[in-house]
Amino acid sequence: MIKKLLFSQPRPSTEHNPYTRLETQFGVQCDFYQFIHIEGLEAREFRQQRINPMDFTAVILNSKLGAEHYFRMCEEMRLNVPDSMHYYCNSESVGLYLQKFINYRKRKVFFPESGNKFEDLLPAMHRRPNEKYLMVLSDIHTDDQINMFAENGIEVTPAIMYRTVTTPWPADKPFDYDLIALFTPAGVTSLKENFPDWKQGNTLIAAFGNGTIRALEEAG
């Protein structure tokens, strides 16, 4: 019988959430623990990629986290981002988030009218054939988006500015769950690194997303 569940994500900030209802309705215990966390690369590490952010006229951002680390890196490298820089974002929320860092003007920030597909930005990109694009990424990423741009005649330079790191499991905390829910491939990696000798036994594992499923299959 499933009585104790672990979700590899932060505890919800509000009391009314699906997990509370799960506990109330079925009498189970829901625990939360972030198996991974994000660390920004230091400027000296980033320089090893031999990329100068000021050589580009546009930045491609696929998350608020990417925006934070782009401006953080520029600050650490003592670079002044020019007011003429263009920003291509995969969603409106990321685009509007830039107000935290720049004097926001619609003519220099682009995002899809709906959804979060970079493909919807291709017309705007093709109108600026001389643009030079830098794409901010994590160390864990796929090349799908970069390949999509290349297939449409747009050259993009990937720049790794932050990385996903395993969060150590507390030594005094038991790991005795009936079900473990993993949400990312990095979570699978963290589980293996934290418990290299762990045997699944009767423990159920829930995986969210095709990438996480593949990571579990590869992990055996």
Describe each model-derived feature in a short phrase:
Residues 1-220:
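Conserved beta-alpha
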